[in-house]
Amino acid sequence: MVLLSLALAVPARAAPSSADEEIDGCLACHGQQDLSMTLASGETAPLFMKSELLAGSVHKSLRCTDCHAGLDEVPHPARQYQSLVQFRASFGEACKTCHFDNYTKTLDSLHYALQARGDLFAPTCVKCHGSHGIARPAEPRSRISQTCATCHATISQAYAKSVHGRALIEQNNQDVPVCTDCHRSHDIAGPRNRAWLMSTPNLCGRCHADPQRMKKYGLSTAVLSTYLADFHGVTASFGGQGTRPTERVVALCFDCHGIHDIGKVSGTAAAVFRANLVKTCQKCHRGASANFPAAWLSHYEPSLTRTPLVYLVKLFYTLIIPFIVLGLILQILLHLWRTVTNR
């Protein structure tokens, strides 16, 4: 291992009295574009920092040593790094000092599991949020998807073409979900995590069951309630597990509508368009005939105009069942009265 020194050929200076004074002192060296060091791998690690990045950062009021702890002395004490990847991966350790709650959430995430296995390319705080030019997470929200695209390029391309992605990118529509709305920010679960998979109907329902939001687009808000009431949702409520631990025998939202490539529900190209629906059903129901989808009422409550027969049958049972129950209760009470009077 090669011992790397960050020592700079400048005389020792007195401790700065303010954050601005400390930043100016650090920029005396780190404002030089050619400042760098050579790592054990032979790679060059740049040590230059653009002052304008920090000026527009949410951390602009912090001292440099709030994040770069132990480097308040000049010359700096020696540090050891094997490669540029390891050098960059080490930056995120400073974040937990202030953001401990979010740091503890990452310990349950798929990203941290990759780090724990020694994957130096796994996402860290700095890889997602940046190092010096740190913006507020939601300004603008489209930055979130762009950040995730650094590693998930193929998925990002599919999202950009989806009904959600196009609304965000082309119209700056703030109603649509970005990556973190579905996958969370710090405690990100893997795509095969069973608990997360089975929670996706409620996840989609956070937006699609919102009356104010769906009213803007003329979409039904009964998507979650109708799903939970039909055969797919009932199976999901029991866990939807097959005979093997990894087997799933129930259709969830993304099985029909897509995962990242979610399209409009209207139009002849839609997966849930009546003419295409049989192909969607055949993903699970092999051998399903052309009239198989007719058994599904879509995400709409039965009505006299859309499904009159189903609506009338439901109305009949809604009215008759209370009378049957009341009749049974009356019969029991009469039997009790007869028993008492005959004694």
Write out the residue ranges for each language-model feature.
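Bacterial N-terminal signal peptides
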Residues: 1-9
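Short sequence/structural segments immediately N-terminal
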Residues: 11-343
